[in-house]
């Protein structure tokens, strides 16, 4: 069983990682191709392409200019500690122990517009390139065309090497669209997190993102290898709802008063 997650736009570049172990991204040669093109963009072009402020555009122009290989602990940081959004706050990898970090490294993969597919301890340098960005490149009009089947093939190889046949999709639609489900050789399970608001259960983005990270933390803390055991996930008041679920979409609900 493997999990896939989206990355985060917010990055924690300052705080040192709590572990020294690191690996290198498998698709770094592809990242280098993209970065060569990104470096050609002026800050104003970045602002228009990514729909960001001038300040953020300038920051990322500087990041692109400084991006260089090889990655080392001195110029890069492990992805799971660099990403700093809602998902990663829910996961809170900084407070996991060594065995739990190894669980993440062995069973979690992070999708990325620039890096394709990452292990949690893969070193990355700061960047901003969301998968849905309409960034024309030498392979097509966007990043989905750039990555093609590269991400899916690596996922299939990863699953095969581990003898696993289940992929738990905790990524956003924007990112999971980079995976070709027709050629993915795995059973696909997509957890859905709903919160009660005014008497109705609905997906609330902030809570759903945090819950994805919480589920990965739950799996790591309980060393879960059987997907069925994920149905026992109960962090922060969530509970599996069998009636609302089906074979591929597992719904977890949380009542309003529990938060």
From Swiss-Prot:
GO CC term, one of those recorded: cytosol
Superkingdom classification of source: Bacteria
GO biological process: response to hydroperoxide
Record Pfam families: H2O2_YaaD (PF03883)
Family, similarity comment: Belongs to the UPF0246 family.
Name of the protein: UPF0246 protein NMC0835
Organism name: Neisseria meningitidis serogroup C / serotype 2a (strain ATCC 700532 / DSM 15464 / FAM18)
């Amino acid at each position: 069983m493997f999990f896939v997650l989206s990355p985060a736009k917010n990055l924690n570049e300052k705080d040192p990682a709590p572990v020294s172990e690191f690996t290198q991204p498998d698709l770094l040669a592809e990242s280098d191709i993209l970065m060569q093109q990104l470096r050609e963009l002026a800050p104003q072009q970045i602002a228009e392409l990514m729909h960001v402020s001038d300040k953020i555009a300038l920051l990322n122009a500087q990041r692109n200019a400084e991006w260089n290989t090889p990655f080392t602990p001195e110029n890069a940081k492990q992805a799971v500690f660099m990403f700093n959004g809602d998902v990663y706050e829910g996961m809170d990898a900084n407070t996991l122990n060594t065995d739990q970090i190894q669980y993440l490294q062995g069973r979690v993969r992070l999708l990325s517009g620039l890096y394709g597919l990452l292990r949690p301890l893969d070193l990355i340098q700061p960047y901003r390139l969301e998968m849905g960005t309409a960034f024309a490149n030498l392979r097509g009009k966007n990043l989905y065309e750039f990555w093609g089947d590269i991400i899916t093939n690596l996922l299939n190889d990863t699953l095969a090497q581990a003898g696993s046949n289940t992929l738990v999709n905790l990524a956003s639609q924007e990112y999971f669209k980079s995976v070709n489900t027709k050629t993915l050789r795995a059973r696909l399970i997509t957890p859905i997190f709903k919160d009660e608001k005014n008497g109705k259960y609905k997906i609330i983005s902030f809570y759903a993102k945090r819950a994805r990270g919480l589920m990965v933390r739950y799996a790591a803390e309980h060393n879960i290898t059987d997907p069925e055991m994920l149905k026992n996930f109960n962090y922060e008041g969530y509970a599996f709802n069998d009636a609302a679920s089906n074979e591929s979409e597992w719904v977890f609900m949380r009542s309003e008063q529990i938060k």
